[in-house]
């Protein structure tokens, strides 16, 4: 027993070692140029992870802004805002405390009352704060279809007359190519270049962005051009060839910053912080920050790039795999291949569970998402246990030792005596032809002293009853036919009724289903076992009657038997 446990434990250790090797070999790593200087600029939205939407909550506080400014001050030379209301007008003064330049934003949409307030506040901020070096009127307003290029050009000219800082608007790069009249109205082009939305792969995104920048330079020579938004999400859905991820985000941003600095390109990274409140943008809108929602830097700015939670997930997968492997230590007569198979299955379930938990731990989820998680685990957890249980059965068939026969069959000869056997067959709405084959098999048994009690229960259809009744009559008086049209207890109830009609001199009762075709020597082989007074029950698995019909039937029979 101890040697068997030791062998099983050794196999679990070996499987766990292979499992660990797989995790190690698949560990994601990346390399990219280091960010040696502070970023040129970061999009800055100082909302905590508890904010559901900036427009639907209280104004952001000075303390929150100051905390977030302190979080980014060591990593950037400037920040860009998108609105000048609801507390965001406090940003320039607080940013000045840490020496940060600010591109002030005025949010423009169809609400003209708010538009007027946004512009009024933004213009005032340019006059009150010397660290404000630009005013961005609107953000993708033309792209959203809320104003035309002509309307935005006129609005920008109006704002330029009210301030001395450069004035522009933020738009997707192709809007600038399509609207030269907009270019003539602004002091510089603030182009949003986000190849993720074009389905560009992470490997090609920087080249694509530089190419777009050069197209803008060629179209508008001499015009100052700023890449006002560039970034890559760390999570979310794939968009054609664009695949988000922690490693991809770090590679893309570090490579882009290196190229931009070398080429003298002005840029702004979107964005400083992950934005859980952007759940309305789908699964990707929340993950563009270089800091997570708790203000932790998501990737190193120099050196190797690694998945931050990968090691934790791998360790959890290994521990779960070992824990799920422990029940197999109770199995007796287990082979090495069987143990390896079971251990591998447990490791697979452990890895799946760890990956599911890692997803929920590293993504921003709503209350509804948590309800989904609880329901999913409630459904999938038992399913995983059922799968492991079925795999245990499969392993015993494929890799286990052949079953041991607990009863030594005696040489087939004439038994010393023939005790009477009463064979009970319960049936419920069964096809008559099938049941007749079962009865014929009983009639062919090499046992002279037997009776057969057939109990049809809850079967009111005469077409199912009368053929069986007639066949029992044909087979003779040894076959007792009972038709109980209404009864409770299902099969157990039918067997109780059969007991009431069992011959008083019957010493042994045999029970078979209505679709069993027993071997002629069934009783001849098993009845002698009851000569041992300690034996009260003998169970003999029955092969499927139709195993020969197809490979599927044969496989089902093999699994059952």
Question: What is the predicted role of each segment?
Answer:
Residues 472-502, 506-507, 520-561:
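Long helical/loop segments within the catalytic core of UDP-sugar-dependent glycosyltransferases
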Residues 419-422, 451, 456:
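Cell-envelope/extracellular polymer assembly enzymes that use nucleotide-activated donors
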Residues 439-449:
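Short, acidic, metal-binding catalytic loop of nucleotide-sugar glycosyltransferases
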Residues 448, 456-468, 485-488:
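A conserved acidic beta->alpha catalytic loop
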Residues 512-517:
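The conserved acidic donor/metal-binding loop of glycosyltransferases
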Residues 327-415:
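N-terminal membrane-anchoring/stem segments of glycan-assembly enzymes
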Residues 104, 133, 171-209, 232-233:
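Aromatic- and acid-rich polysaccharide-binding/catalytic face
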Residues 33-36, 41, 47-49, 53-57, ...:
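Aromatic-rich peripheral "rim/lid" segments of glycoside hydrolase catalytic domains that contact
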């Amino acid at each position: 027993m101890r040697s068997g446990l030791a062998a099983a434990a050794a196999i679990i250790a070996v499987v766990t070692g292979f499992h660990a090797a797989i995790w190690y070999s698949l560990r994601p790593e990346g390399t990219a140029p280091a960010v040696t200087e502070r970023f040129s600029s970061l999009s800055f939205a100082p909302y905590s992870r508890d904010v559901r939407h900036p427009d639907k909550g209280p104004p952001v506080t000075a303390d929150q802004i100051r905390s977030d400014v302190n979080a980014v001050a060591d990593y950037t030379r400037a920040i860009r805002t998108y609105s000048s209301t609801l507390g965001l007008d406090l940003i320039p003064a607080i940013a000045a405390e840490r020496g940060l330049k600010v591109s002030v934003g005025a949010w423009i949409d169809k609400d003209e009352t708010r538009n007027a307030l946004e512009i009024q506040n933004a213009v005032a901020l340019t006059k009150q704060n010397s660290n404000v070096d630009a005013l961005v009127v609107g953000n993708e307003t033309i792209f959203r279809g809320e104003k035309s290029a002509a309307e935005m050009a006129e609005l920008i000219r109006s704002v330029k007359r009210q301030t001395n800082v450069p004035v522009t608007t933020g738009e997707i790069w192709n809007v600038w190519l399509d609207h030269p009249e907009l270019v003539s109205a602004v002091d510089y082009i603030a182009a949003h270049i986000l190849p993720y939305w074009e389905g560009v792969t992470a490997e090609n995104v920087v080249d694509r962005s530089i190419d777009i920048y050069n197209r803008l330079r060629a179209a508008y020579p001499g015009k100052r051009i700023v890449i006002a938004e560039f970034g890559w999400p760390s999570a979310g859905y794939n968009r054609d060839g664009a695949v988000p991820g922690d490693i991809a985000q770090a590679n893309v941003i570090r490579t882009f910053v290196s190229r931009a600095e070398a080429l003298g390109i002005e840029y702004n990274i979107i964005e400083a912080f992950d934005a859980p409140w952007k759940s309305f943008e789908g699964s990707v809108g929340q993950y563009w920050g270089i800091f997570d929602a708790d203000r932790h830097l998501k990737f190193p700015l120099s050196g190797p790039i690694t998945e931050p939670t990968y090691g934790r997930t791998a360790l959890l997968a290994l521990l779960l795999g070992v824990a799920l492997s422990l029940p197999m230590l109770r199995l007796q007569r287990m082979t090495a291949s069987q143990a390896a198979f079971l251990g591998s299955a447990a490791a697979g379930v452990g890895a799946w569970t760890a990956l599911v938990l890692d997803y929920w731990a590293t993504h921003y989820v709503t209350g509804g998402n948590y309800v989904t998680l609880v329901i999913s685990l409630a459904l999938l957890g038992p399913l995983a246990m059922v799968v492991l249980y079925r795999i245990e059965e499969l392993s015993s068939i494929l890799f286990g030792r052949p079953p041991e026969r607990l009863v030594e069959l005696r040489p087939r000869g004439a038994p010393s005596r023939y005790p009477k056997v009463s064979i009970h067959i319960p049936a419920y709405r069964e096809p008559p032809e099938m049941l007749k084959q079962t009865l014929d098999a009983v009639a062919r048994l090499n046992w002279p002293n037997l009776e057969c009690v057939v109990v049809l229960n809850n079967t009111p259809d005469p077409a199912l009853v009368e053929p069986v009744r007639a066949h029992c009559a044909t087979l003779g008086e040894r076959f007792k036919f009972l038709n109980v049209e209404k009864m409770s207890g299902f099969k157990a109830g039918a067997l109780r009724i059969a007991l009431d009609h069992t011959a008083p001199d019957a010493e042994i009762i045999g029970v078979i289903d209505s679709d069993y075709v027993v071997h002629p020597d069934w009783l001849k082989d098993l009845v002698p076992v009851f000569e041992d007074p300690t034996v009260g029950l003998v169970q003999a698995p029955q092969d499927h009657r139709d195993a020969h019909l197809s490979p599927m039937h044969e496989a089902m029979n093999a699994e059952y038997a």
